[in-house]
A protein has these predicted regions:
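Short, gly/Ser/Thr-rich active-site loops of penicillin-recognizing serine hydrolases
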Residues: 152-155, 168, 260-332, 337-338, ...
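Short beta-strands and strand-coil junctions in structured, solvent-facing domains, enriched
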Residues: 251-253, 272-273
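Beta-lactam-recognizing serine transpeptidase/beta-lactamase-like catalytic domain environment
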Residues: 1-247, 255, 298-310, 314, ...
């Protein structure tokens, strides 16, 4: 999306930005996900490496008002004609939007945050999938829940076809030429996947933490971990499918369960079901068995936990609840003692008699 906006604004795809890992703007420092930096990058290389500094600097020069219209053209901020009322439009911010909503001027920091999908930018998964489909097809495709009859004709996007082809090639490189999505490479002869990885940060990283070393997602509480994102389409040569995967608080913590692998498996299933199921059978033992086995184990574990909780509650209630049991027990003991005394007085004990037992 940002790449298309840059090309549309006249940026040459061969222009290079040197990434040193951080960019100072005023009193603030904006960091790249690669702390040591990527070095000099052109547009395709920046997309493949998911370099934050490249897009920070380019959008700083142009302003985010050049990017927002392209974002809307690709489906962000849109409500689609779908049969449910729970859609959230998200937000594609710009200077006019901020002035209207907050009565505040747009800042350079706002542009930098928005350039990597942070700050005020909000998007839902279906918008991301639509964006992937429009980049792949070059048309203003609309999502539908049920396929029936002939699909409506989608108009071409008001974007340069050469620019779209360039971005598709860069997304091919993300997966197949050493980019960040290499684990999404398809194992289907003659079929390639184009994609873009992403991360949605959900917490603020302080300067003190950066100085001491940013904590890994795996070391954070679940709710503080980043969301992992992935959009893709395939086949690159003649796209048929597009998808968006959002793994909430996934944080890119488990490689073989990360979004690129999920995207690969979904597309493989759509294009070659037998191959996908064979691959699934090979990997399922590492997850604890097939889906039926895993669900049975989870159900048993859940029931076990419920039993333990109920048992603990029963013991607590029995101990804590007020009761007449001590008084009843004392009265019973007194009555038994009196009866025994009377019996002993009335009749001598027999030799060899034994105490009563419960057999």
């Amino acid at each position: 999306m940002n790449g298309l906006a840059l090309l549309r604004a006249g940026v040459s795809p061969d222009d290079r930005i040197s990434c040193g890992g951080a960019l100072r703007v005023g009193n603030g420092i904006f960091h790249c996900h690669k702390r040591s930096g990527h070095g000099p990058l052109n547009l395709k290389q920046a997309i493949m490496a998911s370099c934050d500094i490249y897009f920070y600097e380019m959008v700083r020069r142009l302003g985010y008002d050049q990017v927002a219209p392209v974002a809307r053209t690709l489906g962000l901020g849109q409500k689609f004609d779908l049969p449910f009322s729970t859609q959230r439009y998200g937000t594609v911010p710009d200077s006019a939007w901020k002035l209207k909503k907050y009565r505040a001027e747009w800042t350079v920091a706002d542009s930098l945050n928005a350039s990597i999908g942070q700050g005020y930018v909000l998007a839902n998964p279906i918008q991301l999938a639509v964006m992937a489909s429009r980049i792949a097809s070059g048309r203003s495709l609309q999502p539908r829940i049920v396929m029936n009859g002939t699909a409506p004709t989608a108009n071409p996007l008001p974007l340069n076809p050469e620019h779209l082809a360039y971005i598709r090639d860069a997304m091919y490189g993300v997966v197949n030429q050493g980019g960040t999505g290499g684990r999404a490479r398809l194992n289907i002869p003659g079929v390639s996947l184009g994609a873009k990885t992403g991360t949605a940060q959900v917490r603020r990283i302080t300067m003190a933490e950066r100085a001491g070393g940013v904590r890994s997602n795996a070391s954070l509480p679940f709710k503080m971990r980043d969301h992992a994102l992935f959009i893709c389409f395939a086949p690159v040569e003649n796209p048929r499918y597009a998808a968006a995967i959002v793994l909430e608080h996934g944080g890119h913590t488990v490689t073989n369960l990360d979004t690129p692998g999920i995207g690969r498996d979904i597309i493989t299933y759509l294009l070659d079901r037998d191959r996908a199921l064979k691959s699934l059978a090979e990997v399922e033992p590492t997850w604890g068995g097939d889906i039926a086995t895993r669900m049975a184990a989870e159900t048993a574990a859940y029931k076990s936990q419920i039993s333990l909780v109920q048992g603990a509650q029963t013991e607590t209630n029995a101990t804590a609840a007020p009761t007449d049991a001590p008084a009843v027990e004392a009265a019973t003991d007194a009555a038994n003692s009196s009866a025994a005394a009377i019996a002993n007085t009335a009749q001598p004990a027999e030799e060899g008699s034994r105490e009563a037992t419960n057999d």
